[in-house]
């Protein structure tokens, strides 16, 4: 709230000014609603969610604007504004600017979730954005090869096969059709899935660097250009279960075996930051990474719920 009202940076929440921080905050409240109930979430957080939506739709964020087609347009040409935030000499290794796929998947999900908090009663200005995005998201991101562009900025289109598209399937609300969701899961499975997480870039793409080794410069180049990230496995398995339902449970359980094995290596009982994108998928970076641990625990909890049905 301090950032939205006074533009105050937060010493606790790093990079609070990055555009997707606000969208992930709404997602976190959505997870709370699943556990505590929508009514309790409404009582505690509906006003806060609306404040965030007002902040974004009111064009108050310095690096993200809502366009006439309902999509959010983010300025990341000269600075890193997404989770792919490695830089060299102050410039992003993976510049992502314009219509960024996971930003817009999160934005659509946030708008729909707020309608859930209002008891299904549409808020006219948000409902208008949702309906616009039902068309514009597909027109902007879906390509002829049955996957999603990573980002689109006018004539500059990023065709790279990256994991960010998986959020358009894993999130509770999505503008994609069931067939499109299946296509996204299929290509992510074929090109990005490893036993340790999703690759940050397909091996078929130019610039693929699977090994996080060498001096800082070399590691910065590889950080989001082919290394595999366990936290993305959480989103992938959630997306997989959304597409395949209970029939996908055994596959998801098998995928977690490699993570169970990993907990007896490196730092015992936890999961490192990232892995090489090629075999033998060696663990790299920080020996324990909270995002990865949380994502795997979420999948374990999700599987318990599927098995209880």
Specify the residue positions occupied by each region the protein language model found.
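C-terminal non-catalytic interaction modules
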Residues: 269-273, 304-309
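Catalytic cores of carbohydrate-active enzymes
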Residues: 1, 57-69, 73, 99, ...
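Short, charged N-terminal helix-start/capping segments
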Residues: 30-55, 155-176, 223-224
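Aromatic-rich carbohydrate-recognition surfaces in CAZymes
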Residues: 1-75, 101-104, 108, 229-241, ...
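Acidic/His metal-coordination segments adjacent to aromatic residues that form catalytic metal sites
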Residues: 1-16, 76-99, 150, 214-223, ...
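Aromatic (Trp/Tyr) and acidic
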Residues: 9-12, 86-97, 104, 157-195, ...
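Secondary-structure transition/capping motifs at alpha-helix termini
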Residues: 34-39, 140-144, 175, 243-248, ...
